Amino acid sequence: MLIIQSYHLAQRKGLYTAGLLLSYWFFGMLAHAESLVSFAPRLNIDNPIVLQRADPWIYREPQTGCYQFIGTSPLFDQIELRSACRLNDLKLAESKVIWKKHQKGNMGAHIWAPELHYFNQTWYIYFAAGDVEDPWRIRMYVLANSNADPAQGEWQELGQIKTPVDSFSLDATTFEHKGKRYLIWAQMDAARTYNSALLMAEMDSPVSIRGPVVTLTEPTLDWEIQGYKVNEGAAVLIRHGKVFVTYSGAATDHRYAMGLLWADADSDLMEVKNWHKSAKPVFATDAELGRYGPGHNSFTVAEDGVTDLLIYHSRDYLELKGSPLSDPNRHARARPIYWDVQGFPVFFSDQGD
């Protein structure tokens, strides 16, 4: 049966329509004609993939195809890893504690948003933490482990990522592009009126940045300033000649949503003029689907090694049990990403997983 779906995205400066997406369903498999648009196959993902893990991050090992999962622990007190070679097995996998918060000083509270990266033949975990004496003095820190298995060996503390302005900062993510490694993070600026903006700089080591710092985005759009003025939780996906950066905005309740930045892959990423920003969120709450406050995502690929997946957290109810931070039920979920004829990701926010 031929299905024609017209998907209009009021983004890319609010001036374009992504166009018609054509797909054929045959024996339950989704295919595409003439390579007009990239479609994901119908995947048997058992959502949620992990319960009570906000800020989910997945690293897929290229040699084995197995998944390493990490996310924010509900008590904000430790960092855990779990691994499985099937996405649906992550919820059953043993969760191994590989690091615990300090009992005094820094790295002693609000252990948030750990990300697992592998480069320089070393595993790195980037995370945010507050001090025991001042839990809201949030800064960014790095752990390292040279063991082939990140669940084994010793995780060493490399220290804090220092930024030119010493202020509330979190959600560090790193990526390499054209021989350069970059860091994107969220940070507060006392001279501004927002809670956090997204900044970027080149890195000269796994724990330090160099050169100028550029502001990729500040929370200025209406959807980004609901409850709090926030841009945070960046994730990078390089596809189809573009560098895409998703991010999250607003308060961490049902108003939380995802936006999109992009730049041409051949452009100078440190030039702000080369970056573009969606005018509307690309993924947001949908009460009819029972999805509330989706965001702080990462990307991986399905077990076929080809299909891009969006990994994100959300709640399945509106009324919180306490505050957005004390309510533990932000569950990790996965869904395929579609690609339009212009090489942009289509998230189908109005459709379920």
Model-derived regions: residue spans:
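N-terminal secretory signal peptides that target proteins for export/translocation
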Residues: 1-11
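Bacterial N-terminal signal peptides
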Residues: 18-28
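Carbohydrate-active catalytic/glycan-binding domains of CAZyme proteins
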Residues: 34-353
